[in-house]
């Protein structure tokens, strides 16, 4: 499966009377987009805002971040199972609006959603502060329940990103990157002297709006499955998830998974990258045992020498992470685990809820319990009063001057467990 990503660099976004791309600027017909989104009669109000890096703007609570992509050649379309049909994606050509993103927000009671500050110290913790963002803020009818509310906002984000991407249809690429996932027998034979490595991609699936979708299917309902890395780039996996903001994988992160990109970087040089095994993080012990057993079985069938395993979320999924580590090790597969830590504000507590001697190579994305003070912004998009309620916030988080004291857990992407964040680790 061979996929070309044609990247079009976006250096500005503006509202205009026609949606188009010209001179690295994305122009958006606000009225046309509004009419598209308003087709869902469950939505009562829509507000569109454009924000740029360095703007004194706070977005809260953030639901999802999505990169506009358009499939121009090959089977299927971007976001299969939602925007396009169920055809297998991951081959052909896909255009990417690099530097632009869609951010969704809205008043959803009880959600563990987070903050994006476009300026100040908070901006340094969120990778999304570096994008030119179209923020879509939607209200829905009062009788809409939480699960349906999440579904409405999820579709609003995907529809908006797909609408914007259509502007790239006739725009020449500034940069082209090619990725290929060969059939397994062919891939194994290509570099017989290099260790065979795969990526174990854990997807949040705890339920209660902690969900991820694969080709439109709730990941709670899947068993571990082999995928081409190129399918992921075409939007086969999307976020429907309201887990803590710091380490949730937004749809943007799935589209731009840095673990996959890094594995391709040294493919054929240091190792033979054999592909992706997706698995879930269900809450029952039986589901955890089943998924980790089948993950280890697939690794054994591929004759893997090693695997990179990434977690999404914390607490309950720590058990899935360690089960995967232990069972892969029992099959002779070496592992490197990627996670983040909840080690207390002083960093002295146990970092994970589970542990095992097999987990002897671990990459940390940071301690989510660290506290930061975010200064007031000139403009707030959304509802700042949610700062006391979101994960990482606490009673008294909001100060009279508009500043917010929170754990970095509340900042979208601060400790992302795919490494899509700005933190680093140092030894002293």
Language model segments and positions:
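Extended, charge-rich low-complexity interaction segments
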Residues: 362-395
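Long, compositionally biased, glycine/small-hydrophobic-enriched stretches that function as flexible linkers
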Residues: 1-223, 395-428
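Glycine-rich, charge-decorated loop segments at or immediately adjacent to ligand/cofactor-binding or catalytic sites
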Residues: 342-360
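A short helix->loop->beta-strand "cap" motif at the edges of active sites that frequently abuts
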Residues: 330-336
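Membrane-embedded hairpin module used as a gating/binding unit in multi-pass transport
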Residues: 188-280
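Proline-aspartate-enriched helix->loop->beta-strand connector
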Residues: 303-304, 308
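Gly/Ser/Thr-rich loops at beta-strand to alpha-helix junctions
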Residues: 204-205, 310-319, 341-344
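A general structural motif
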Residues: 282-296
């Amino acid at each position: 499966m061979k996929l070309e990503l044609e990247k079009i660099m976006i250096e500005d976004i503006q509202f205009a009377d026609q949606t188009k791309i010209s001179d690295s600027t994305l122009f958006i017909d606000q009225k046309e987009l509004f009419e598209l989104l308003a087709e869902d009669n469950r939505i009562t109000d829509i507000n569109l805002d454009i924000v740029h890096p360095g703007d004194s703007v706070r977005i809260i609570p953030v639901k999802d971040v999505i990169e506009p992509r358009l499939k121009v050649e090959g089977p299927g379309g971007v976001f299969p199972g939602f925007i396009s049909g169920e055809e297998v994606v991951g081959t052909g050509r896909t255009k990417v609006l690099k530097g632009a993103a869609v951010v969704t927000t809205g008043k959803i009671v009880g959600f563990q959603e987070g903050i994006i500050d476009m300026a100040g110290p908070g901006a340094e913790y969120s990778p999304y502060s570096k994008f030119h963002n179209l923020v879509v803020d939607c209200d829905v009818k009062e009788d809409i329940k939480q699960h349906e509310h999440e579904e409405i906002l999820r579709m609003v984000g995907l529809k908006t990103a797909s609408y914007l991407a259509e502007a790239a249809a006739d725009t020449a690429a500034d940069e082209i990157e090619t990725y290929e996932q060969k059939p397994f027998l062919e891939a194994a034979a290509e570099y017989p002297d290099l260790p065979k490595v795969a990526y174990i991609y854990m997807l949040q699936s705890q339920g209660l709006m902690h969900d991820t979708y694969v080709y439109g299917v709730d990941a709670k309902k899947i068993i571990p499955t082999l995928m081409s890395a190129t399918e992921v780039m075409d939007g086969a996996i999307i976020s429907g998830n309201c887990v803590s903001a710091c380490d949730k994988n937004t749809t943007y992160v799935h589209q731009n998974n840095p673990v996959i990109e890094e594995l391709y970087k040294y493919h054929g040089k240091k190792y033979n990258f054999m592909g992706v095994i997706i698995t879930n993080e269900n809450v029952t012990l039986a589901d955890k045992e089943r998924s980790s057993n089948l993950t280890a079985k697939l690794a054994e069938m591929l004759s893997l020498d090693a695997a990179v395993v990434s977690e999404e979320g914390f607490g309950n999924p720590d058990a899935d992470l360690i089960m995967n580590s232990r069972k892969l090790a029992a099959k002779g597969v070496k592992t490197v685990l990627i996670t983040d830590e909840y080690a207390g504000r002083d960093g002295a507590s146990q970092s994970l809820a589970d542990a095992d001697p097999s987990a002897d190579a671990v990459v940390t994305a940071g301690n989510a319990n660290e506290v930061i003070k975010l200064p007031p912004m000139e403009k707030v998009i959304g509802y700042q009063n949610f700062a006391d309620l979101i994960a990482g916030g606490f009673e008294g988080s909001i100060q009279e001057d508009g500043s917010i004291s929170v754990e970095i857990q509340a900042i979208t992407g601060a400790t992302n467990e795919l490494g899509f964040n700005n933190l680093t680790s140092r030894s002293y």
